[in-house]
């Protein structure tokens, strides 16, 4: 997706330790035109599948998931990083955040993730695949079916794709970062 790649090279910031900051257009301040283009691309990539629900984890995955759900005319559900007292029939799992270097217990109500669901998971980043593995666990607990996972940005050098594909998961990434060494952003063509 050329528009996204151009924006990453133009406005993305690299930090030591393999961190790519895209908060000026994806996960703090958002560019709605870019987000619509991201949604359109996920719709194209997963056209012809039997997806009937979009899923993500709060917070940075919500915008692309909403846009994708809107364009596909499908409901969107997100796993919460804190369990509210009002949640019933909660499914939960532990997820490690690479960026924040901490564990979260993520929860979702089984009222909104059921055996009837064919799920497309959408998120901002694929690094080591920790969040995605947590989602796979929640989907298994619910009895739903995972159709595939779509990521705005994949950091290929952190091997999350390999982890997921070894489990039979279809992975689609819109921009694949090959390297961030010396804080230079290298994107796969």
Swiss-Prot record:
One of its GO terms (cellular component) is cytoplasm. InterPro entries: PRibTrfase_dom, PRTase-like, Pur/Pyrimidine_PRTase, Xanthine_PRibTrfase. Its main location: cytoplasm. GO terms for molecular function: xanthine phosphoribosyltransferase activity. It is found in: Cytoplasm. Pathway: Purine metabolism; XMP biosynthesis via salvage pathway; XMP from xanthine: step 1/1. Converts the preformed base xanthine, a product of nucleic acid breakdown, to xanthosine 5'-monophosphate (XMP), so it can be reused for RNA or DNA synthesis. This is Xanthine phosphoribosyltransferase. It is an enzyme of class 2 (transferase). Belongs to the purine/pyrimidine phosphoribosyltransferase family. Xpt subfamily. It comes from the Bacteria. Xanthine binds at residues 20, 27, 155. Its EC number is 2.4.2.22. Homodimer. PANTHER family: HYPOXANTHINE/GUANINE PHOSPHORIBOSYLTRANSFERASE (PTHR43864), XANTHINE PHOSPHORIBOSYLTRANSFERASE (PTHR43864:SF1). Keywords: Cytoplasm, Glycosyltransferase, Purine salvage, Transferase. GO terms for biological process: purine ribonucleoside salvage; xanthine metabolic process; XMP salvage. It catalyses: XMP + diphosphate = xanthine + 5-phospho-alpha-D-ribose 1-diphosphate. 5-phospho-alpha-D-ribose 1-diphosphate binds at residues 127-131.
């Amino acid at each position: 997706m050329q528009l996204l790649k151009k924006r990453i090279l133009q406005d993305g910031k690299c930090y030591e330790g393999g961190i790519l900051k895209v908060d000026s257009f994806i996960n703090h301040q958002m560019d709605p035109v870019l987000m619509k283009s991201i949604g359109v691309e996920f719709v194209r990539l997963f056209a012809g599948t039997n997806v009937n629900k979009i899923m993500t984890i709060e917070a940075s995955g919500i915008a692309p998931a909403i846009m994708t759900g809107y364009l596909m005319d499908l409901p969107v559900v997100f796993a919460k990083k804190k369990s509210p007292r009002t949640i019933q029939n909660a499914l939960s799992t532990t997820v490690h955040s690479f960026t924040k270097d901490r564990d979260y217990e993520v929860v979702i109500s089984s009222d909104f993730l059921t055996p009837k669901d064919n799920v497309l998971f959408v998120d901002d980043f694929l690094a080591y695949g920790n969040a995605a593995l947590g989602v796979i666990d929640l989907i298994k607990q619910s009895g739903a079916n995972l159709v595939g996972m779509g990521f705005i940005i994949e950091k290929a050098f952190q091997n999350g794709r390999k982890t997921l594909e070894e489990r039979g998961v279809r992975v689609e990434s819109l921009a694949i970062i090959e390297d961030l060494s010396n804080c230079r952003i290298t994107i796969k063509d």
